[in-house]
Amino acid sequence: MKKRTVAAILMTSAIALSACGEGGSSTSYSGNNASSTIEASSELDSAEGASNDQATDIQTDGNKDTTASSSEGEKKQKGKGSKSGKKSEDSSEGTLAYTLSDGEEIEGGTYTAENEDESAIGAADDTVATITGATINKISGDATSADTSSFEGVNAAVRVYGNATVTIEDCEITSDAENATGVFVYDGGTIYISDSTVDVTGGGAGGIQVAGGGTLYAENLTVTSASKAAIRSDRGGGMLVVTGGTYTSTGSSGCPAIYSTAEITVSDAECVSENSRAVIIEGKNSVTLENCTLSGNDQSTKEGSIKANVLLYQSSSGDAEDGTSVFTMNGGTMTSNSGAMFYCTNTSSVINLTDATFELSDTGEFLIVSAGRWGSDGSNGGNCVLNAEEQTIEGTITVDDISSLEMNLEQSDYTGAINSSGQAGTVVVNLSDDSTWTLTADSYISEFEGDLDNVDTNGYHLYVDGVEVK
């Protein structure tokens, strides 16, 4: 056995981390009472995306009268039910067609919003309420500001904020207006939603969302979004925990299954993006997947786009704090139908993989760490740490000359080549005694730690700091 350590001086890539982000009708209530090109958020790849500086101010009349009608016998209330169904002004912009009262328990009924900047139902001001078996529709009335819609939930079908807590069970929620998210929580609010459907067909809106410190727990949902991510967050972050269910994004290249500017955990669920990346993490945020099935089909067409199933990056829009993006996958299967499996650019990132299965696209690329469309030329590479435990990895890895990679393999097997075209960025490979690396082409790295007997060159050559070592 030949134990050998080959070291080189690590050249840390400079990463320029810019701020981040993305880029009269009647209302009825019935029933139960940088130096180069700098891009904004990746979701702006879709035509429906809007940036901060495109936002317009909104003027909302909180005293505006609305009509409300209820179906007799459809509603069963307990506690202090709000029976008027009148519109009330929000803590910021926008209104609610029906405002839940503290202690209210709704069973059945239909709740509908038709006006601009109006949600069908919601709660604020420390309210605790429950909705069961209801139909909730946002059928018309576009948001007057894409920003207040995306950051504060104005115009969402369901909107909870101001430290309110709402439990939603067995409900049907639809949204068909512009910038009208399905279920939105922010400003210290909490939503527990289970066994429900959320169908969002309007532009500029996601399925279930947190922002501004909101918390959302979702269980066994069927969520479909036609414009933005089925599971998403925005400025101010929060926490989103998903267990079970199916989450599908059907929109354009800016419509991933999961978009994170928060802490997002998904377990035992199926997540599909028909025309975009499966997962996007922006800035100092995370996505953790436990025994999930995911697929993406990146159809990015913008100049300089690098197609990939998972994007870890920092944009310039101000929606996510600068820092390390973290992707963790334990078990489950992820399929890339277009492009590399992972792409890290203009940020630092950590990818943690344990006993997961990856199905590569025809490109055969597993990981790209490089400059891209975000940040300033010359300082917008990526710094990535890849940790694999009890993991099988296949595919090529590319690290450009302003980027870095540290790959740590424990009880894992890697079959592929790293920088097969020659030395570029800093690459460190740490191979445990119970791990292997089988080359599929000549590979060029900066530093190797481990037993070279565990490296099968397969007829190719391994170069460490410019020296052929095997």
Residue map of PLM features:
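Bacterial Sec-dependent N-terminal signal peptides
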Residues: 1-10
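C-terminal motif of bacterial Sec signal peptides marking the signal peptidase cleavage site
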Residues: 16-19
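Bacterial signal peptide processing site
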Residues: 21-24
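Extracellular/periplasmic low-complexity linear segments
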Residues: 26-93
